[in-house]
Amino acid sequence: MGHVGAHAEILEGGWAEFYGNLLERCPMGYSVSVGPFVPWRGVEGVGEARCGGCKRGEGLRVSARPLAGMGGVPCRLMRFAMRMDGTLDILRGGEVPTAGALAGLLAAEGQALETLCRAAQRVRMERVGANVYLRGLVEMGNGCRKDCFYCGIRRSNAAVHRYSLPDEEVLAAARFAFRNGYANVAIQAGEDGSSAFAARIERLLYAIAEATRGELGVTLSLGEQRQSTYQRWRDAGASRYLLRLETSSSALYAALHPSDAVHSFEGRRASLRALRDCGYHVGSGVMVGLPGQTLLDLANDLLWLRAADVDMVGLGPYLEHPQTPLWARRGELWPRAERLRVAVAMVAVLRLLMPTINIAATTALQAIVPDGRERAIAAGANVIMPNITPRGRQDDYSLYERKPLAADAAEDSLPSLAARIAALGCRLAVGERGDSLHFALRDSPAGVW
């Protein structure tokens, strides 16, 4: 099985793209390999290889050895396992791998994905503990001035039934959350930049604070606004704000939005900077599996989130909606199971990259498989957002096809949720706010937006 002069090509970050069996590292720490792609038969082989990373080891004698528990596995998987272990070592050391190395982690499947998730869960337990915090999601309205090509409530969708919850229904949902131990609400709506909307949210925030003695945490997800509006809402009691960038690639962003001032990539980034300046716990996130998106794009998304120094992240699989322009490109999409797998890997890698942030197990994961949120929690997520919007309105907040709906009585679902989370070795932290530890530890308003 040995081959003299076999080739090992070193890619970005020192990771080898192997043409053959996986072998031990060269004296400078680079992996080298010999031989063609063949199934591993458990037989040791000897060969010579030149390591292209350190330019040493020409004629180096190396031996091919089976990795523990991988007998009968094709060499390409053993090859990947060694690369993954090296990247995990870099992350555990507190360093930042290259985008190419992170993309390799995002390709993990099967046993490799389980290994990645276990590593992330260990870090999560060590750094932020076993708690999973609740955010009661209130979908306040589905009118939107944006016309994003992927979204079911986009401005041009004449088929959607528009609604706006009365203030009393929003307050009732907040009281419900407070009474039932959620400790937090997340108020979400389509984007409205009017002064009337800004004033309405300000009034609601003061009313929620009065109704809950200022104890209920409030997260807002209301799109791009003026910095003065963000500040008004912060002063009225909102402490967290989620504004998803959706992708850190300006080219991909342009393919997802109309080309106008309302849909500016730089404007989105400027809004995130404004939120930080106003003192919010800043959250962002991305979609996984967009048409034309690559694993390298997603790896760069992870690096952007880290560079931006966000306090919380919500990410999930892109789910197509038939009343959107991107529906025409559904033939280009990864299978839904693949989008789920990569989204779970994204959660795990993000936990390793940013150990102290809050990461949400998003509803979009549940839209693919019933235990989608639980898979994210097993990969390091520590926030879950049950939908407490009045049931009659949830159908109308249709961002994507086959969106899961909450139980008829939201309070009845908490014991079941707690049991499922406990089965993962975690604890549903009823009555606890669960503010981002990352925010508490920050010394300065860092972040490259």
Question: For the regions a protein language model found, what residue spans apply to each?
Answer:
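Canonical Radical SAM [4Fe-4S] cluster-binding loop centered on the CxxxCxxC motif
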Residues: C51, V128-E169
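Catalytic cores of alpha/beta
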Residues: R226-W233, P291-L305, A367-A378
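Core AdoMet radical
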Residues: R155-L171, A177-L272, H281-V288, D311-G314
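Intrinsic disorder
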Residues: S33, V46-G47, L60-S63
